[in-house]
Amino acid sequence: MSDTPQSPAQGSLAEHDEARPMRTVKSFVMRAGRMTEGQQRGLDLGWPKFGLELSDEVQDFDAIFGRQAPRTFEIGFGMGHSTLEMAAAAPDIDFIGVEVHKPGVGALLNGLLTQGLGNVRVYSCDALEVLRHCVADASLDRLLLFFPDPWHKKRHHKRRIVQPEFAELVRRKLKVGGVLHMATDWEPYAEHMLDVMSAAPGYRNQAEDGRFVARPQERPVTKFERRGERLGHGVWDLKFERID
């Protein structure tokens, strides 16, 4: 999730089966950024408490969080503002956030320290590698993908994170009844998401008309989104539920 239209923290899409050597197409761009004092504080003091390292083994998140609770996985939380808002509003839910942009990671960690929140853990690496290796199958209640990079140019469409392989990976990680919730402000990408997910087996579109849902109350409105609304820009939300 991000307050900018292009969140840099999406994963890499495998072009081949996982059992074979993989070439990957990155759906994110690593961007350098200057750290503020608060962001550096977050990394220095918050990472030892809330940070997680990529592992080749499935992680016991019940042990990591110290409880059993509904679990939400967020790809690309940007500067972490919406993540903090969701975590504060739902203390009974555990959040796993992934972001490669270090200032954003620092900002979220600093916010966790400042607000005294304990229901968030953070990775700073390729989100799809975390899903593949660290997250058990059928263990997530929700997966959030808010405002991923739309890769506007046609020659870059292969970089979009939402592809058939992504849909299948997410389906494996969601519980039956779990939901993939996506949002974008770029209508052609919204249509692309809809096409990919409508063709993906094992899902049900929760939209009554089979297209898009109204903005769910649980998704915070970002500053970028408010600016867009004032300019008449649209935002499209999609919710697909795993049914088998």
From Swiss-Prot:
- The answer to whether UniProt assigns keyword Lyase to this entry is no
Q: Region (Disordered): which ranges?
A: 1-20
Q: What is this protein called?
A: tRNA (guanine-N(7)-)-methyltransferase
Job of this protein: Catalyzes the formation of N(7)-methylguanine at position 46 (m7G46) in tRNA.
Catalysed reaction equations from the record? guanosine(46) in tRNA + S-adenosyl-L-methionine = N(7)-methylguanosine(46) in tRNA + S-adenosyl-L-homocysteine
Residues forming the catalytic site: D149
Quote the InterPro entries the UniProt record gives. SAM-dependent_MTases_sf (IPR029063), tRNA_(Gua-N-7)_MeTrfase_Trmb (IPR003358), tRNA_methyltr_TrmB_bact (IPR055361)
Keywords attached to this Swiss-Prot or TrEMBL record, sorted alphabetically, are: Methyltransferase, S-adenosyl-L-methionine, Transferase, tRNA processing
Q: Gene of origin?
A: trmB
Report the EC number(s), separated by commas if there are several.
2.1.1.33
Which family is this protein grouped under? Belongs to the class I-like SAM-binding methyltransferase superfamily. TrmB family.
Start-end of Polar residues biased regions: 1-10
User: Which GO terms label this protein's molecular function in UniProt?
Assistant: tRNA (guanine(46)-N7)-methyltransferase activity
SUPFAM superfamilies of this UniProt entry? S-adenosyl-L-methionine-dependent methyltransferases (SSF53335)
User: Which PANTHER family does its entry note?
Assistant: 3-DEOXY-D-MANNO-OCTULOSONIC-ACID TRANSFERASE/TRNA GUANINE-N 7 - -METHYLTRANSFERASE (PTHR23417), PENTACOTRIPEPTIDE-REPEAT REGION OF PRORP DOMAIN-CONTAINING PROTEIN (PTHR23417:SF14)
Q: Could you tell me which Pfam families the record lists for this protein?
A: Methyltransf_4 (PF02390)
What pathway does the UniProt record associate with this protein? Answer: tRNA modification; N(7)-methylguanine-tRNA biosynthesis
Q: Locate the residues binding S-adenosyl-L-methionine.
A: E74, E99, D126, D149
Please give an example of a GO cellular component term from this record. tRNA methyltransferase complex
Q: What's the domain of life for this entry?
A: Bacteria
Native source organism of the sequence: Pseudomonas aeruginosa (strain UCBPP-PA14)
